[in-house]
Amino acid sequence: MSHALRAVFLDHASLDLGDLDMRPLHAAFDELQLHAASQPQEVAARLHGARVAISNKAPIDAQCIAARPELELILVSATGTNNIDLAAARERGIVVANCHGYGTPSVAQHTLALLLALATRLPDYQQAVRGGRWQQSSQFCLLDFPIVELEGKTLGLLGHGELGGAVARLAEAFGMRVLLGQLPGRPARADRLPLGELLPRVDALTLHCPLTEDTRGMLGAAELALMKPGAFLVNTARGGLVDEQALADALRGGHLGGAATDVLSVEPPRNGNPLLAPDIPRLIVTPHNAWGSREARQRIVGQLAENAEAWKAGRALRVVNAG
C-alpha cells in the first residue's frame, strides 16, 4: 500500500460553490480527489486507495468501513456525524473529526432575520405590494397585517450553547427579555425553566439544540397549545424537534402568530412535507441554508485542514469518536 496521503471528498458541492479558497485543504494531502456528490452505493468504490475520507452527508457505514482497510481518517465537513458509523470506525482505529462553531454568526443572523420577518409580516407585505394592493390603497400606507414590535417582548431559547448564546445577545440588542428552557433528558438547572413553564411565558421561541431520542418531537400538539396565542416559533436546529403536522395545524387554526423553519425532518423533502402545503398561513420555510454564508463555508475549509494537519502530527483536534 502506498503511503501517499490520498484523500477523497465525497460531496464537496455541498460546501464549495466555486467561491471558496480550497488551497488549505489541498495542501494538507498529497492528493485530493473531489466528487460533487456521492450516492450511498458509490461511496466504498470511490474511497478505494484513500487513507482519508471527507464527507458532509455522504454515508460511511460499517460495511463501507470494512471494505476499505486503508482508511485511517474521516473528516466531516459539518457538526453532525449521523452519516458516519462511529462505533465501526472506532473499532477499526479510524479517527473521525468534525467541524463546529463555523456557522454561529450566520445561523444567528438567519434566526433573527426569520423572527423579524414574522414580526413585521414581511412576506405578506411583499406579496401584497407585488399584487397591487398598496397601489390601490386609499391611504399612503398599507397596514393590512398586524406588525409586532420585539422591544419588551420575551424570547424563549431551547438550547443555550454557542449558537443559542449568540441569538440571545442579538435578541437583547432588540430589547427583548430572554428566558432559557430545560431540554428533555438533561439534568435540571436552576437557570432553566421546564418546558411547561417556559412556553406560556414567551412571545417567541427559538430552537438551538441537537436532535436526540430525548428531544425528537419535543414540540408536539400539546406543547404548541401551551404557547401564548400569537407567539412565534423559529427553528434553525433540526426538523425532527417539532411535530410538523401539529405545527401546520396550529398555524391553520390561528393559535400561533407565525412560524419559520430552516429545517425539515427529511431533507431534501422529495416526497413532500406537511409544512410545504400551500394553504398554511404565516409560515416561512428556508432550505437549510442558515449556515451557508461564504464566510461560514470558508471556516469549514480551514477546520478540515486544521483537523488533517493535527492528525498528521499525532494530535487530536475536534475528534468525535475518541475512547
Model-derived regions: residue spans:
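Phosphate-binding beta-alpha-beta segment of Rossmann-like dinucleotide-binding domains, i.e.
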Residues: 92, 100-154
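Short beta->alpha connector loops at strand-helix junctions that form conserved
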Residues: 36, 77-78, 94-105, 182, ...
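Rossmann-like dinucleotide-binding domain for NAD(H)/NADP(H)
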Residues: 96, 233-323
